[in-house]
Amino acid sequence: MSRPRRRGRDVHGVLLLDKPQGASSNDVLQKVKRIYNANRAGHTGALDPLATGMLPVCLGEATKFSQYLLDSDKRYRVIAKLGQRTDTSDADGQVVEERPVTFSAEQLDAALESFRGETQQVPSMYSALKYQGKKLYEYARQGIDVPREARPITVYELLFIRHEGDELELEVHCSKGTYIRTIIDDLGEKLGCGAHVIYLRRLAVSKYPVDRMVTLEQLRELVEQAETQGISPADLLDPLLMPMDSPASDFPVVNLPLTSSVYFKNGNPVRTTETPQRGLVRVTEGEENKFIGMGEIDDEGRVAPRRLVVEYPL
């Protein structure tokens, strides 16, 4: 007889985890889920095992709104090793080509400029994108190369930090879907020497405050502290969470009176004053402005429900 599935607690919000190097995003997600004893958890855009930095982990009802973080801008600090190209475009792969580093400062400036603004990027074979239902890296590990279409990306800012010997350090502010490994691989080809990533840190996601990031070790220390004090770990862990609607913070807010919100929460579009002309909105209710879900302005100017909060902490 199978054992009954253990149910976690209903905790809702977004933890800004500082992912350690060497761990997969899913591994650290599961650790956070266990530490919080959460019934649901999901991350918002995987980081490579080599990478560190901000990994927003959505708990409970916040998982419904994680898509908006997948669509948000990101900022990275990256160090590339010049003169070597690898099959994965990072230090975890095998070196497939070595060339001397001979470019000038002017050539570097020109190469960097070519990546700024709106461009097209062909994703790496070592990525989680899917082709015919299978992830690209699964094909790559079998030595199979499959066709990949170039996708539009935007590099809002590409800052030169330093060039010392065979290392080049940059800071990148980019749109969703941008692969930093691919930028470095393409840059190495433009410079004629090849390059791969040896250090990558995600500095920021959307507008989340960097000083709210916490490590797994800090979470474990809080659990131990709670046990020492004889209190629930939730008393120390839950204050670390950002609001469940924070993934959608870029969208305007529409507040509904309680007389209207009951219809909205039952799946019906409602009319209200001072709504945007179109697009998605965050919907709150009452004088407390309690978040109740995402809506979209329909053709009649009503707020139609799109994603609703089912459970909400008291």
UniProtKB/Swiss-Prot annotation:
Example of a GO biological process term: mRNA pseudouridine synthesis
Binding site for substrate: 43, 76, 179, 200
Protein name in UniProt: tRNA pseudouridine synthase B
Catalytic site: 48
CDD domains: PseudoU_synth_EcTruB, PUA_TruB_bacterial
Gene responsible for this protein: truB
Record function comment: Responsible for synthesis of pseudouridine from uracil-55 in the psi GC loop of transfer RNAs.
Gene3D superfamilies with a match to the protein in the record: Pseudouridine synthase, PUA domain
GO molecular function, a single term: RNA binding
HAMAP family: TruB_bact
Catalytically driven reaction(s): uridine(55) in tRNA = pseudouridine(55) in tRNA
Pfam families: TruB-C_2 (PF09157), TruB_C_2 (PF16198), TruB_N (PF01509)
